[in-house]
């Protein structure tokens, strides 16, 4: 890299890393005023509309969205394709990926929600973007994420008592990606 480019790079880095302190019109530092909920400081978590919603409302909405996706999977008129192909005409990212995937329903009656959509890779290899054919020099692997679910905890039959629920994190395949 020649020296003008090096100098420009150094200047850009120094501007980016320089501490920024707000100043008032006289050039003095502003005092520590009351923190604004819209402008978080270095030790504050930004407050947005989502974080102001009560946690149970977000969980209900999350479960409703999962239920809608499961209903769409059950009611889908499209046959479950198990073919390794990319369809660039579709807007769904799982069908346009170089490691396409489909969804199946993961059912567990002791879980709330009992049904979760789970990704399954449609290819052993990955789709070559130049030939649009499966290339087995790479491998399609599922991408996992942890999702919150509620588990029903009921006492065993000799012990009477009501069932309880506990929120736990469950690992679910959410998509597929290519690896070498």
Curated annotation (Swiss-Prot):
One of its GO terms (molecular function) is cytokine activity. Glycans are attached at residue 75. Its main location: secreted. Keywords: Cytokine, Disulfide bond, Glycoprotein, Secreted, Signal. Residues 23-32 have a biased composition (Basic residues). It is found in: Secreted. This is Interleukin-17B. It comes from the Eukaryota. The keyword NADP does not apply. Residues 1-22 form the signal peptide. GO terms for cellular component: extracellular space. It holds the Pfam family IL17. Stimulates the release of tumor necrosis factor alpha and IL-1-beta from the monocytic cell line THP-1. Disulfide bonds join 121-176, 126-178.
